[in-house]
């Protein structure tokens, strides 16, 4: 039963120095070991309690709701960046998440990174040139035809705000390029995009948007303009060029009139008339008239010089035709058969048989 009693003496025994010296001689090794162990245990307990309190504080803090995912064409406001709030937790939680303090690269400026629900992301302010990032430049909107945005009311106004001040739900269309910053055209005073095909992401225009009348077509019918000018007593507008494509160069060359050449043969008047009594024939050439007069006079100046032939003719073509009889030359040949003729009129009669 002596071993079941408490090992440490009571506080009343420390009043007597003799008793204290006896106790030290009785337990020479217990006191230094117990003192060193208590210090180590106290330091470990303090560290565990501090970590436990930090963990309990981090767990007790309510988690903020996750931010809504940004739309595909959302551009962060240059004048009012979202406030940065320190993450909940103590020193250990801050050291375990060093990526929050890492600086963002130039390609990530102006973007919102999607993080788990328990994290809060710090958004850096965009660059001055407005490039890099999926968003619409100030003054540019994506909506129906004619939707334009004039000067922004303030730096805190967003280009994709709805009537209630909240951003519309993200459209179904993906971003322009997921693997690189998108380059948008420089913002101007009035700019509009072509009309989309429609979808749930395109709602009613915001307060800074209005419908502009469609631009008149560059080319069209001019009957209405001429009628309106005539009704107002003004001169009709000058005729504009045709919308048809230009003709080919060959057609243009053929359409031009050729100088020095007549498109149709000019009928020559018969000025040469036979003066013989009772004959009123006329000819266009004087040679023809001379040959005709030989029929009246009986003159035959063209003689055949073939041996034994004394034929005479009033015309040279008649002598040539006669001379072919002696030589057997037949220059007129039928292209449908093998027959040939010495006279062209004989060939014409032969061709009628093939028809």
UniProtKB/Swiss-Prot annotation:
Positions of region (Interaction with WWP1): 111-268
Motif 9aaTAD per record, residues: 43-51
Stretches that traverse the bilayer: none
This protein's domain notes: The 9aaTAD motif is a transactivation domain present in a large number of yeast and animal transcription factors.
UniProt keyword GTP-binding, yes or no: no
Record organism: Homo sapiens
Protein name as it appears in the record: Krueppel-like factor 2
Region annotation (Disordered) ranges: 1-42, 55-90, 120-209
Protein family: Belongs to the krueppel C2H2-type zinc-finger protein family.
Xref: Pfam families: zf-C2H2 (PF00096)
Gene name per UniProt: KLF2
Biased composition (Pro residues): 62-85, 165-198
Modified residues (Phosphothreonine): 173, 244
Keyword entries, A-Z: Activator, DNA-binding, Metal-binding, Nucleus, Phosphoprotein, Repeat, Transcription, Transcription regulation, Ubl conjugation, Zinc, Zinc-finger
Family annotation (SUPFAM superfamilies): beta-beta-alpha zinc fingers
């Amino acid at each position: 039963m002596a071993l079941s009693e408490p090992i440490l003496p009571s506080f009343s025994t420390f009043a007597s120095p003799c008793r204290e010296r006896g106790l030290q001689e009785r337990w020479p090794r217990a006191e230094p070991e117990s003192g060193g162990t208590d210090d180590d245990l106290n330091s470990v307990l303090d560290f565990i309690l501090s970590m436990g309190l930090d963990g309990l504080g981090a767990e007790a803090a309510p988690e903020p709701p996750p931010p809504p995912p940004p739309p595909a064409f959302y551009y962060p406001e240059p004048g009012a960046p979202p406030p940065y709030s320190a993450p909940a937790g103590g020193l250990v939680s801050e050291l375990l998440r060093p990526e929050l303090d890492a600086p963002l690269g130039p390609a990530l400026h102006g973007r919102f990174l999607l993080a788990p629900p328990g994290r809060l992301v710090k958004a850096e302010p965009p660059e001055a040139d407005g490039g890099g990032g999926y968003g619409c430049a100030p003054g540019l909107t994506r909506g129906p035809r004619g939707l334009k945005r004039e000067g922004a009311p303030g730096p805190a106004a967003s280009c994709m705000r709805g009537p209630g001040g909240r951003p519309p739900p993200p459209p179904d269309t993906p971003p322009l390029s997921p693997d690189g910053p998108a380059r948008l055209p420089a913002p101007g005073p009035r700019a509009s995009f072509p009309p989309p095909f429609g979808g749930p992401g395109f709602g009613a225009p915001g307060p800074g948007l209005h419908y502009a009348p469609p631009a008149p077509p560059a080319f069209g019918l001019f009957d209405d303009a001429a009628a309106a000018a005539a009704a107002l007593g003004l001169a009709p507008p000058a005729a504009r060029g045709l919308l048809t494509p230009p003709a080919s160069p060959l057609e243009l060359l053929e359409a031009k009139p050729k100088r020095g050449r007549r498109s149709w043969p000019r009928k020559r008047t018969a000025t040469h008339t036979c003066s013989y009594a009772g004959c009123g024939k006329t000819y266009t050439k004087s040679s023809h008239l001379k040959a005709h007069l030989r029929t009246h006079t009986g003159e035959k100046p063209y003689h055949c010089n073939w041996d034994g032939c004394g034929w005479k003719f009033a015309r040279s073509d008649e002598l040539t035709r006669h001379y072919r009889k002696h030589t057997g030359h037949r220059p007129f040949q039928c292209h449908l058969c093998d027959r040939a003729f010495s006279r062209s009129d004989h060939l014409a009669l032969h061709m009628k048989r093939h028809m």
